[in-house]
Amino acid sequence: MIRIRFGMDVLLVLLLATCLLTPAHGTPLEWDFAVTLRTKIQFMDSSWQTIATAAHEFDELSALTFDESEELIYFNDLKHRNGSIFSLKRDLIAANHVAEQTIARTGNESVGGLAYDPLNMNLFWSDTEQRKIFFAPIHGSATPQVLVDLSAEGGRPDGVAVDVCRRKLYWTNSNVTHPTVERINLDGSNRTVIISSNIDMPRGIVVDQLSDRLFWIDDLKGVFFSVESSKLDGSDRQVVLKDKHHEPLNLAVTNDAIYWTDRTTRAVWSHPKVPVIKVTTTSKPDEEDSTDSTDFKDPEPVAEDCPLVRVANLSEEARGIVARTGFYQRLQKDHHCASIVRKVKERVDEQSRKFEIRSLLDQKIKVLEDERCMNDGEYRAATDLCICPTGFKGSRCEIRECHNYCVHGTCQMSELAYPKCYCQPGFKGERCELSVCSGLCLNGGHCRVSKDENEAPSCECPAKFGGARCEQNSTEICSLFCRLLKHEPEMYVPFGCHSICEELAQDNSTNIAIPQYQHLEVCLTPRVWTSSVIIILVVGIVSSLLLVAVIVQGIRRLYKPKRPRIRKTFVVRKQARTNSAGDTPLTNRPLATEQCEITIENCCNMNICETPCFDPKLVEQTLSKSSCKEDKKILIHNMEDDLY
């Protein structure tokens, strides 16, 4: 019986060892990003490949937050009848997830944003319907309390974020009439508006503890949106990105990028954030090469990545998003966060001590658990996780962060637990991937780098080339002086040009490609009479002549004298006239009592539209046989007949 029991104990130990030492694929343990869709939570790795999904029993998920100290995710379901906020943890035995109710539903809540304080273990959330911000402890059944009430002032709280190190809560007020970004102490005191101008409708917000900055999304008017950043007090405001045709809700920040969910495209997008942690690329004195200089070849050019990247396509509408930040490793030496991290770690360690060793089997399991975490990682039985020391990562702390990180340099971990490269002489860049000689020397010049890091690299130029970058062709320059020497033999010639002039004279070649040198065109005599200049000159002369001709013709017509108008005056006297038998009232008109004067213009001054001064038919009949005196008589006689 003892042997059978001992065999069963050994078998059980082996089974447990297999479970502990085998990576739990398909579980949320290895994830780097978590995104809430409408009906599930999707876990993804660093390359945005889906590794697991959870919370399928819910219908309307929205916001979520992450407790990295205990590996718990808190999320909200808008349609659940009993609960409002739930927690998601990993089952150690079944290797899957378990969702539990954390905050009971008290009414028609509409959670807009979630945040968690790992020190006091409190949840904070915004209610867009009641226009208030609540908080409640995750353990126990305490009634949620109001931290901020915006209903009286017409505000609408949306995104919330906790500054764990400085003990403050930040939120966005998406009221379109008076949008703001505000903060308050976690105890409810010292409420402050930090952003109130040049903002339309702020949505999600996050506190980046690594850079001590705020990042938030602003849904601008029309189809535009922006991602903005500032210091924790609202100063040093920067626009990280401005684009259009997105409907972003929430965002997450890592060391080098910003990620946000977009409801329009059903995707997760990323954009580089401004690097705050400067990577040192200087050379360490004890690692310098003993030689005075080193030869380098130009590396291959590095292509730039698109700043706006669609990292994940989702099957449903994307809403909340969280990312791992390495809370323990990154902030252990931060002067604002070191004390908070220490207190949180002490609390987690106290919970781990509750798993006491009671038998030999437990001792064997304990040994296997300790062996699960590599590189002195600390095993957490409550969460089945390894807390890795600085410089290591992975589910078992098996990955060294400096491994293959620096291309031409030595890697060390910085005070903020990030890899930092000390570059070899002649290299630069965040990972020492760029050569200082890249593109420096021209025309086949050879780059030389001194061991003194303060001394700039130099170029060794081939024959007949000079300059700091071998950009000057000495043959082309000296050829100009050679031409001048033919006319002024006593002029000054730079050193070395005499021998080149002799070579050119022996070569008897005049086809020197002087215009090919980019700086010599200023020394050449410019060609004035080019074809374009001649064409413009001819066109200008012809146009000037035509203009002068038009002006002269206009002046002549303006000052040309008019033709004289010839006027003749005839005095007609009254004559005795007897009435004939054939006179009628129409033919026998009354005559003037005295006399009248008739002015007759010369017909040569009349045009065709004027009334002629005599009957043309009568003139035709008498033209051949009448003299000038008879014409006048006929004309006067007809005029007398026309008078009334």
Swiss-Prot record:
Membrane topology per record: Single-pass type I membrane protein
Cytoplasmic side: 553-644
Localization of this protein: Cell membrane
Alphabetical list of InterPro entries matching this protein: 6-blade_b-propeller_TolB-like, Cueball_EGF_LRP_Nidogen, EGF-like_Ca-bd_dom, EGF-like_dom, LDLR_classB_rpt
Keyword annotations from UniProtKB, A to Z: Cell membrane, Differentiation, Disulfide bond, EGF-like domain, Glycoprotein, Membrane, Oogenesis, Repeat, Signal, Spermatogenesis, Transmembrane, Transmembrane helix
GO molecular function: calcium ion binding
Positions bearing carbohydrate: N82, N108, N175, N190, N313, N473, N508
Disulfide links within the chain: C402-C411, C406-C421, C437-C447, C441-C459, C461-C470
Pfam family of the protein (one): Ldl_recept_b
Transmembrane annotation, as ranges: 532-552
Signal peptide: 1-26
Gene Ontology biological process terms in this record: oogenesis; positive regulation of circadian sleep/wake cycle, sleep; spermatogenesis; triglyceride homeostasis
Main location group: membrane
Domain EGF-like: 398-430, 433-471
UniProt cross-references to PANTHER family, sorted A to Z: PROTEIN CUEBALL, VITELLOGENIN RECEPTOR-LIKE PROTEIN-RELATED-RELATED
Protein name, entry field: Protein cueball
Organism of provenance: Drosophila melanogaster
